[in-house]
């Protein structure tokens, strides 16, 4: 009687690991360019096409297209982050470049949104006061700054897929999987999402097109945060439940219970 043994899987060669690192770095650079364009796109500054510029369709068609574009990003961003999807594509996408591929896919969808976005140039509000305009513009830039700082407080290069590819090339230090709340995370549970909300809503001149973008993005952030927190409770259990009780989700909470995280 003959039995078949499963073929031995060869570990990736150093050349393959270097290729993975190069891929991850290129994905990261593409993400940075996309993020910079997103800032200009939302802020109507420094890029050829913004949220309020360019030719647009009739407003019902423009509204439909814009909502579909945000929905496309929301579906891609959420589905690819699910554990079940990661298990499904793991045989195809090696673990060291899994996160970089996710980041690349998200960047590509954003580029599609920039390209196909339909402006709806009807004013919802326009702040005439210099002081009011300056305050809103400052909040806009503070929002992007908050996002950047928040990424480095956790692990910037791991979040965007570079660290995983680098760790495949060299012995990685043991990962501290304990629950931590560094700096901003002691004030609000999701400072990155808070930053996005600030950046999307703080504008001296709100058009209907910008409002559609801000409103649909806010709905997605609220839904996505709930999904993310479900995963975090599954990972950290009671520690994260206590964190939820003591710290606001997207806005700082005035209430602080004795059992809060250090």
Curated annotation (Swiss-Prot):
Catalytic reactions on record: methanethiol + S-adenosyl-L-methionine = dimethyl sulfide + S-adenosyl-L-homocysteine + H(+)
Gene deletion effect: Cells lacking this gene are unable to produce dimethylsulphide (DMS).
The UniProt record lists the keyword Transferase: yes
UniProt family annotation: Belongs to the nurim family.
Highest rank taxon of the organism: Bacteria
PANTHER family named among the record's database cross-references: NURIM
Disulfide-linked positions: none
A GO BP entry: methylation
Induction, per UniProt: Constitutively expressed.
Gene Ontology molecular function, alphabetical: methyltransferase activity
Name recorded for this polypeptide: Methanethiol S-methyltransferase
Entry EC number(s): 2.1.1.334
Function: Catalyzes the methylation of methanethiol (MeSH) to yield dimethylsulphide (DMS).
Keywords tagged on the record: Membrane, Methyltransferase, S-adenosyl-L-methionine, Transferase, Transmembrane, Transmembrane helix
Transmembrane feature ranges: 22-42, 55-75, 100-120, 134-154, 195-215
Membrane topology, as annotated: Multi-pass membrane protein
Subcellular location: Membrane
Gene Ontology cellular-component annotations: membrane
